[in-house]
Regions:
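Catalytic phosphate/metal-binding cores of nucleic-acid and nucleotide-processing enzymes, i.e., regions
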Residues: 1-66
Length: 66
């Protein structure tokens, strides 16, 4: 993953960033599946819009607190 997002009181999220038309490589698919199989939160975000939406989700969690 490109980023690991850690917020207080929430599980870590492994984030893969792609362009709008970007695709996961076969190795990325394998690694993300391994993380999911271990019960980890995994997100693949395509383009700036999805990144902004994800950041808004994070901000909401921080505002709501634990």
């Amino acid at each position: 993953p490109d980023r690991i997002v850690v917020l207080p009181g929430y599980p870590a999220v492994f984030v893969e960033l792609k362009t709008i038309t970007g695709r996961l490589t076969s190795l990325q698919r394998v690694q993300l599946k391994r993380l999911k199989d271990m019960g980890q939160a995994v997100r693949v975000l395509h383009g700036e819009h999805e990144v902004k939406l994800f950041l808004e989700e994070c901000k909401e969690k921080l505002r709501d607190g634990v």
